[in-house]
Amino acid sequence: MSKDTIADIITSIRNADMDKKGTVRIASTNITENIIKILLREGFIENVRKHRENNKYLLILTLRHRRNRKGTYRNILKCISRPGLRIYSNYKRIPRILGGIGIVILSTSRGIMTDREARLKGIGGEILCYIW
């Protein structure tokens, strides 16, 4: 685990996806819970459970599987902001991923939200990651 929790989440999900594993275990923090709620709501993951192990809370994610074939859906997750280089955007300049098919997760003054929610509320923030 590094100090960049967002990169840890994205890397864990990407590695489990490439290794064709069905579940991922991630340390539970407020930021990780908010990002996972967005991924669950947008349909990129199937299920989330909170588990306590040795006085630490873990989130157990179930990745979304294809109906007829074995393996998970291929989601591309890309971390944008990092501790050494933060990327900020106002609501007018938030990028659209694949013409609106993908999502951008932002950290705003009103919490972590998707690009669509930020545009509707008219607020910008730090661009955390792209998912498509």
Curated annotation (Swiss-Prot):
Q: Which SUPFAM superfamilies match?
A: Ribosomal protein S8
Record Gene3D superfamilies: 3.30.1370.30, 3.30.1490.10
What domain of life does the UniProt record list for this protein's source? Answer: Eukaryota
Per UniProt, what is one Pfam family of this protein? Ribosomal_S8
Report any one BP term from Gene Ontology.
translation
Primary localization:
plastid
Keywords attached to this Swiss-Prot or TrEMBL record, sorted alphabetically, are: Chloroplast, Plastid, Ribonucleoprotein, Ribosomal protein, RNA-binding, rRNA-binding
InterPro entries to which the protein is assigned, alphabetical? Ribosomal_uS8, Ribosomal_uS8_CS, Ribosomal_uS8_sf
Oligomeric and partner information? Part of the 30S ribosomal subunit.
Regarding protein family, the annotation reads:
Belongs to the universal ribosomal protein uS8 family.
Function recorded in the entry:
One of the primary rRNA binding proteins, it binds directly to 16S rRNA central domain where it helps coordinate assembly of the platform of the 30S subunit.
The protein's name: Small ribosomal subunit protein uS8c
Q: Please report the organism this UniProt entry assigns to the protein.
A: Drimys granadensis
Source lineage: Eukaryota, Viridiplantae, Streptophyta, Embryophyta, Tracheophyta
